[in-house]
Design a protein with these regions (language model features):
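Short gly/ser/thr-rich secondary-structure transition/capping motifs
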Residues: 25-28, 130-135, 181-184
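Short His-Asn-centered micro-motif
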Residues: 47, 152, 184-186, 229
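Extreme N-terminal, non-catalytic leader segments
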Residues: 2-41, 214-223
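Structural motif
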Residues: 44, 148-150, 182, 226
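General beta-strand structural signal in soluble alpha/beta enzymes
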Residues: 108-110, 151, 183
Length: 272
C-alpha cells in the first residue's frame, strides 16, 4: 500500500515556438514514485463495514508485486487470528499459489478456530491460540525479516480479552524502522488507534430497496460494491476482492476471471 497520498498532476499539451506542436504529456499521473513513499507505518482498518481483511489482502498483493518488479528486499507475513484451518476462505487457493510461485516473498500463519464466540465463551484453546499467534508476531517484528506484517483480526482478539493490550501496543510502537504493520478487524481499541499513522473505518451503506436480512447479505455473491470516502484502503480492498475471486477460480474450478481496470493510475509506481 502507498503510505503517501498520491496527488493528481495535470500536464497539458505544450507547443514549441516556431515548430509544430508536440505532446509533452497527456492525462493525469497519480502514482507516487516508490522512492518517495513513506514506509514503516502502522495501519488500522476497523469498522462495521466489509473490506478490512480485503484491504490487507490488497496490501499483500502489492507488496509481492514490489518484490517481483523492483527486486527489492521485501517479504510479507500474513498472520490471521480467529481463522484457523477448520474453515476455508476464498483467498486460500490464491495465497497458496503465490506461496508456490514466490516462496521467498510471503509466509502465512493461521491461528484460532473459525467459530464465532463471545468473551464469556472463550476457552483455554482460544487463549492459547491467540498467544501462539502473538508470539509468532512478536518474533517476526523483532527479527526485522519482514517488510510488511499483516495482523488480520487482531482487533477482535483484543476486544475478546485474549491478549494483553499493553503488550501489543508496546510491541507495535517499538517496531523496526521501515516495517509496515497492518491491523484489521472490528473494535480497534483507542490506545492502538492513538499510535497508528493511518486509521480507516469501514462503514456499510446498503441500498434501501434491499429487504434481505444482514446475514443473508453477507452470503450474497455478485452485485455491485462501491468503496468510497476519505480514508485509505479503497483500492486495496478492491485488489483483495480480486484475489478472493482468483482463489475461488482455483479452488472451485469455476470460470472466474478478473478484470482490474484502473483510472487515473498511469504512472509506474503501482506494484500490483
Amino acid at each position: 500500500m502507498e503510505s503517501k497520498q498520491a496527488s493528481g498532476n495535470h500536464e497539458d499539451v505544450s507547443k514549441d515556438k516556431g515548430s509544430a506542436s508536440r505532446t509533452k504529456a497527456i492525462g493525469i499521473v497519480t502514482a507516487a514514485d516508490s522512492r518517495e513513499r513513506r514506509y514503516g507505518q502502522l495501519h488500522i482498518y476497523d469498522g462495521e463495514g466489509k473490506g478490512k481483511s480485503q484491504a490487507a489482502l490488497g496490501v499483500v498483493l502489492r507488496t509481492i508485486g514490489l518484490g517481483i518488479c523492483e527486486k527489492k528486499r521485501t517479504r510479507v507475513l500474513l498472520l490471521r487470528f480467529l481463522k484457523g484451518p477448520g474453515r476455508s476462505y476464498d483467498e486460500d487457493a490464491a495465497i497458496e499459489a503465490l506461496q508456490q510461485g514466490f516462496p521467498h516473498l510471503i509466509d502465512q500463519v493461521r491461528t484460532g478456530r473459525a467459530d464465532f464466540f463471545t468473551a464469556e465463551q472463550a476457552t483455554k484453546f482460544d487463549i492459547s491460540e491467540a498467544k501462539r499467534g502473538w508470539d509468532i508476531a512478536k518474533g517476526a517484528i523483532a527479527s526485522a525479516l519482514y517488510s510488511v506484517v499483516v495482523l488480520d483480526e487482531l482487533n477482535p482478539v483484543l476486544d475478546l480479552g485474549l491478549l494483553s493490550l499493553d503488550d501489543v501496543v508496546k510491541t507495535l510502537r517499538s517496531r523496526p524502522d521501515g516495517m509496515e504493520i497492518i491491523v484489521t478487524g472490528r473494535a480497534a481499541p483507542p490506545s492502538l488507534i492513538k499510535i497508528a499513522e493511518l486509521h480507516s473505518e469501514m462503514r456499510a451503506h446498503r441500498a434501501l430497496d434491499i429487504k434481505d436480512s444482514s446475514q443473508n447479505l453477507l452470503n450474497l455473491s455478485g452485485g455491485i460494491e462501491i468503496y468510497t470516502g476519505e480514508g485509505k484502503g479503497k483500492s486495496t480492498s478492491a485488489l483483495g476482492k480480486a484475489l478472493q475471486a482468483i482463489g475461488r477460480g482455483i479452488s472451485q474450478d469455476k470460470s472466474h476471471r478478473v478484470l482490474i481496470l484502473q483510472w487515473l493510475k498511469g504512472g509506474s509506481g503501482y506494484t500490483e
